[in-house]
């Protein structure tokens, strides 16, 4: 255990033991302790850049909005649980609900648990959310907008109405060691924006690594983004594991690396929506996107009868945008149906090389 970790634990223990709500840490920043029943938002509002708001073990009620750069919001592990305020609706609500009142009220009105909220003119940089559970929110467990260098680690996002963890208009994020389970849509959803039609955003190297994504409609959705990595994750029991999605807007989505993931038995059945066919048995799906690298993944036993079913699927875009110059190489695929590799896209330059597989549509891709 390193000295920083020892100092952090000692400070937390001292706060719990003495009953103090805030105390200076060894780094010169303040740790604000919040016990169940106390206001998390009040502690967040009083914190300065570099401070830590530490949530004690137990259940905390209500939504939290973070607008302070450099803030750390940390729990004490999965036993630190954030749930909606008593009486709050658990039905999914549309984006852009009531915006009046305090930031936390706005976050709650949108159906979110923790919001990291910046604006086009004033982003929120360097926020960390760690070591807690967010569950039961109508829309999203954690939602970030205009957040640069956001870190989300060791978070459990479970049974939220739409997304477990979601970002829009954000760059250089790190999502590591999280569990997203049984959320209504994607466990982890990264997009340029969901409200407007815009070209893909360069994320500056966002990393999604070593997460467990299970029982969601889609494990990870990458929508209209460029330049990020999805690596070392375990995805199982979803309707679809990974979606990399673009459309006709420019610049085109792409430059995503999906490598060294375990993608197994994503055979949950999800009905058709207004935007998408029914889903079942989809491993990695590329649609309307370019210059991606899909490599060294283990993709097994994903079985379904949807047009999007299969181990790795390059799918013809619903809006007619082709997928081009995608490299699918050195993956291990077994027991996927209707095939391990599926290409229904007329785009040029997509290559399939060095994959270990038995079946493909069309034939000859293995």
Language-model segments: residues:
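Right-handed parallel beta-helix/beta-solenoid
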Residues: 2-5, 14-45
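Right-handed parallel beta-helix/beta-spiral solenoid domain characteristic of secreted/periplasmic
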Residues: 28-38, 52-54, 63, 70-137
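The right-handed parallel beta-helix/beta-solenoid scaffold, focusing on the short coil/turn
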Residues: 30, 51, 62, 69-71, ...
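Parallel beta-helix/beta-solenoid
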Residues: 48, 68-69, 77, 119, ...
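Extracellular beta-strand solenoid repeats
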Residues: 54, 65, 74, 83, ...
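Extracellular beta-strand/beta-solenoid scaffold signature
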Residues: 88-119, 136-143, 159-168, 183-203, ...
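Leucine-rich solenoid repeat scaffolds
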Residues: 320-366
């Amino acid at each position: 255990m390193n000295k920083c970790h020892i100092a952090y634990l000692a400070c937390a223990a001292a706060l719990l033991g003495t009953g103090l709500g805030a105390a200076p840490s060894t780094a010169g920043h303040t740790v604000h302790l919040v016990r169940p029943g106390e206001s998390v938002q009040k502690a967040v509002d009083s914190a300065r850049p570099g401070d830590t708001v530490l949530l004690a073990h137990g259940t905390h009620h209500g939504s939290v909005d973070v607008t302070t750069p450099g803030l750390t919001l940390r729990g004490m592990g999965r036993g630190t649980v954030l749930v909606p305020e008593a009486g709050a609706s658990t039905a999914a609500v549309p984006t852009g609900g009531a915006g009046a009142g305090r930031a936390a009220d706005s976050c709650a009105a949108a159906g979110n648990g923790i919001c990291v909220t910046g604006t086009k003119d004033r982003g929120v940089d360097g926020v960390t959310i760690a070591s807690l559970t967010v569950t039961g929110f109508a829309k999203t467990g954690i939602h970030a907008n205009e957040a640069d260098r956001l870190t989300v680690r060791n978070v459990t996002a479970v049974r939220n109405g739409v997304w477990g963890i979601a970002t829009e208009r954000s760059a250089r994020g790190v999502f590591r060691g999280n569990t997203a389970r049984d959320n209504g849509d994607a466990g982890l959803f990264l997009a340029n924006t969901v409200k407007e039609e815009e070209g893909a955003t360069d994320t500056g190297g966002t990393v999604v690594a070593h997460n467990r994504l299970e029982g969601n409609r889609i494990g990870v959705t990458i929508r209209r983004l460029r330049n990020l990595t999805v690596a070392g994750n375990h995805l199982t029991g979803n309707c679809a594991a990974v979606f990399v999605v673009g459309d006709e807007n420019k610049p085109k989505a792409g430059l995503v690396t999906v490598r060294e993931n375990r993608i197994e038995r994503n055979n949950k059945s999800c009905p058709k929506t207004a935007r998408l066919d029914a889903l079942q048995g989809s491993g990695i799906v590329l649609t309307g996107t370019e210059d991606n690298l899909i490599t060294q993944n283990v993709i097994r036993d994903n079985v379904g009868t949807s047009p999007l079913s299969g181990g790795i699927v390059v799918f013809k875009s619903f809006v007619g945008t082709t997928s081009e110059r995608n490299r699918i190489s050195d993956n291990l695929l077994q027991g996927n149906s209707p095939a391990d590799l599926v290409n229904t896209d007329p785009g040029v330059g997509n290559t399939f090389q060095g994959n270990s597989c038995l079946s493909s549509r069309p034939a000859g891709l293995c």
